[in-house]
Amino acid sequence: RQGVTIAPLQGISEVKIKKNKDGTDYLSVSIAGPMRSAGGTESAVTLLIADHVRKIAGLSKFQANSFDDETGRFVEELRIYEREASSFQFHILDEDIEHVISNLPVELAGVDTDPYEVVNHKGMTRIQTDRVRGGALRVLNDGLIGRSKKLLKRIEMYNLDGWEWLGDLKGAVQTGDNQEDAAAKRMREVITGRSVLSMPNKLGGFRLRYGRACNTGFAA
């Protein structure tokens, strides 16, 4: 098994019980940062676990506030982070962001991680910062949406209900028209000093694998 570079449980900074507009209680999970995008499926599973805990505790589902436009806040925040702070593993559509925030049974919150503020969605009632929340955005972008198809398999395996709406997402969007475009984009994002051994999906390309496995002789 290949290594996972996110520790989702350590990435949780706080768990709260908060109030919906109708007075019902819901569960809010605050994600810390910074976090890397590798292991996005595992980071998204954190919210599946949180939803299971919510059901056991008898809490209501999270209801996104329309009067505060919490869905619009996530769209603006993610695009600012993408433009000013750091890139994501996948590019996703605005409509997918809105669909996820509108249907999440638990609140995806987070601490601010970068000195960039939203412009149109400041001073919101249930969001305590105007700055971008990198950890929460990575769970949303590269976990819930970018790996929605893999997540649906986990949901089926765990026999969970209430997450069927993930099947309506378009998921990760391929931005390159051909392999040359995709390769050029990856090369632009390579950190100076890092060697490039092979491009993804290259037939016969060199790839490092970490961890214990019989075929490497490190199975003890």
For every predicted segment, state its role:
Residues 1-220:
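Extended, Lys/Arg-rich, non-catalytic nucleic-acid recognition/anchoring regions
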